[in-house]
Amino acid sequence: MANPLYQKHIISINDLSRDDLNLVLATAAKLKANPQPELLKHKVIASCFFEASTRTRLSFETSMHRLGASVVGFSDSANTSLGKKGETLADTISVISTYVDAIVMRHPQEGAARLATEFSGNVPVLNAGDGSNQHPTQTLLDLFTIQETQGRLDNLHVAMVGDLKYGRTVHSLTQALAKFDGNRFYFIAPDALAMPQYILDMLDEKGIAWSLHSSIEEVIAEVDILYMTRVQKERLDPSEYANVKAQFVLRASDLHNAKANMKVLHPLPRVDEIATDVDKTPHAWYFQQAGNGIFARQALLALVLNRDLVL
């Protein structure tokens, strides 16, 4: 039976239903337990990073190689025809799509990945982050990590801390967890970096509980997941960045009242928002979370590029 993600564009987490998410996570678990080094051996995948990235690019490209795919692409658009000669994004994608079986793309402009789908023909586009909008594959690895550590994706208490305005990871993760039952959200951010109203409206429409808080201390005893984010210097003016960057910092001493199995997650890179003394606690799980990116992205690539996937 053909899988529902075959040749599907993955631009927003909302392109995936709850059943789709469960399929990706189940596939990720199978690939983690049983590697498939030749699954994509006849595929060529473009890795097109128009914006700087370390973890996402290396994670995606490692995933491609470990499934046996050939990888082409770039990590600096300044050295492409788009950057040097003024070629349009539409023309760039139109040409690349004639070479490859799938395109993984990061771009600083919101909506760029969706635009790319209009020019990629039958070649699926996977969004690796578009401005402050969406980061669906980060959400997949977040969900995989939450499911591994908590044993479920429903009836969770989840706190999100830091830059909730520009942090595309928290937008995608909130939308994804809203597809499951009984989850409750705690948003902890300075006013200038509050969760966008459209996310709050979505939660209200679904009847999902959420609340705003001014400190981690207010909620630490209640939560199963504490999702930290950095204040994104590249998206703020210098004076605003200086005012808010140190407002929410997690230290080991803040975790004394946490549940025994509460996990601290972070999409990385961190700057000052998680003190290094947290690393030694059993709550710190952000490096394992990053490692899970390999399996979540392998799962998505495998499903998008195989009509009938049997593992």
UniProtKB/Swiss-Prot annotation:
**Tree of life domain:** Bacteria
Reactions it catalyzes = carbamoyl phosphate + L-aspartate = N-carbamoyl-L-aspartate + phosphate + H(+)
Give a Pfam family name: OTCace_N
The reply to whether Transferase figures as a keyword in the UniProt entry is: yes
One GO biological process term is: 'de novo' UMP biosynthetic process
As recorded in UniProt, its EC number(s) are 2.1.3.2
| Keyword Cytoplasm carried by entry | no
InterPro entries documented for this protein: Asp/Orn_carbamoyltranf_P-bd, Asp/Orn_carbamoylTrfase, Asp/Orn_carbamoylTrfase_sf, Asp_carbamoyltransf, Asp_carbamoyltransf_Asp/Orn-bd
Q: What keyword terms does UniProt attach to this protein?
A: Pyrimidine biosynthesis, Transferase
Task: Enumerate the residues binding L-aspartate.
Answer: 85, 168, 230
* Gene Ontology terms, MF aspect: amino acid binding; aspartate carbamoyltransferase activity
What are the cysteine partners in each disulfide bond? Answer: none
Cellular component, GO annotation: cytosol
Which pathway does the protein contribute to?
Pyrimidine metabolism; UMP biosynthesis via de novo pathway; (S)-dihydroorotate from bicarbonate: step 2/3
- Please tell me where carbamoyl phosphate binds in this chain: 55-56, 106, 135, 138, 268-269
* Function noted in UniProt: Catalyzes the condensation of carbamoyl phosphate and aspartate to form carbamoyl aspartate and inorganic phosphate, the committed step in the de novo pyrimidine nucleotide biosynthesis pathway.
For this chain, the family text in UniProt reads:
Belongs to the aspartate/ornithine carbamoyltransferase superfamily. ATCase family.
Subunit record text:
Heterododecamer (2C3:3R2) of six catalytic PyrB chains organized as two trimers (C3), and six regulatory PyrI chains organized as three dimers (R2).
This protein is called what? Aspartate carbamoyltransferase catalytic subunit
* UniProt lineage: Bacteria, Pseudomonadati, Pseudomonadota, Gammaproteobacteria, Enterobacterales
